[in-house]
């Protein structure tokens, strides 16, 4: 879910791949639906460099280009523009993919993860995302693969899945479910803020799906729900032809 430290973790991984993996002229790329979104993780990484004397001596920050250069090995961490899905020829050592659920199609994902790192000894593709509402998307495809591996239906030793989220059958109003979905609840996000958001969603059905998606990391069928399905189901009753 939102505000659980995903960007900070991704920034640390990007810096490790760029500066600490022993790879000469490593190419590490930050990807998202647009350059602005991809810059979020980059900006966190740049701040980490500035706060670390050892890194700040060795890493050149080119803010205007959204590029970090680790000078001892000539390695780079580069934010890519949104149209990179039309380009090829990357020699990728690492990719940090932010908010995968916002990808409009699978083109960028395929370009960056299918073969671009084959010439590297140990390429890593690090994907972070909140749940979305498009079950035909590349993000949902990856989400289902992750669940299948976690639950033992599939085996892929190259894929390490981590999912924090509520199950479809969980009570979305239960604070225990909030904690299950938000590992840093009470640290980066105060429980009172989640409680207030939940109460608002109870009073305004149109907010329920946003709460489920953004606070509980649940995949929903639409961004806005006009009526909770349990209330819709209660409207079912027999109708005779005479009544019609």
Over which residues does each language-model region extend?
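Phosphate/NTP-binding elements of NTP-utilizing enzymes
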Residues: 1-244
């Amino acid at each position: 879910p939102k505000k659980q430290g995903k960007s900070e973790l991704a920034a640390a991984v990007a810096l490790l791949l760029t500066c600490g993996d022993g790879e000469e002229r490593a190419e590490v790329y930050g990807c998202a639906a647009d350059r602005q979104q991809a810059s979020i993780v980059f900006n966190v990484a740049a701040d980490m460099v500035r706060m670390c004397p050892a890194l700040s001596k060795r890493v050149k920050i080119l803010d205007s280009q959204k590029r970090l250069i680790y000078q001892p090995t000539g390695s780079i961490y580069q934010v890519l523009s949104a149209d990179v899905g039309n380009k090829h020829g990357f020699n990728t050592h690492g990719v940090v993919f932010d908010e995968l659920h916002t990808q409009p199609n699978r083109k960028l994902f395929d370009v960056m993860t299918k073969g671009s790192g084959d010439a590297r000894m140990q390429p890593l593709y690090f994907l972070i995302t909140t749940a979305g509402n498009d079950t035909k998307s590349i993000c949902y495809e990856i989400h289902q693969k992750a669940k299948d591996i976690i639950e033992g239906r599939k085996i892929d030793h190259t894929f390490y899945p981590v999912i924090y989220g509520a199950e479809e059958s969980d009570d979305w109003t239960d604070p225990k479910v909030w904690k299950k979905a938000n590992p840093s609840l009470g640290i980066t996000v105060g429980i009172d803020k989640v409680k207030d958001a939940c109460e608002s969603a109870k009073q305004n059905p149109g907010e329920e799906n946003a709460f489920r998606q953004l606070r509980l990391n649940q995949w929903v069928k639409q961004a806005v729900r006009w009526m909770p399905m349990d209330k819709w189901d209660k409207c079912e009753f027999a109708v005779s032809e005479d009544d019609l």
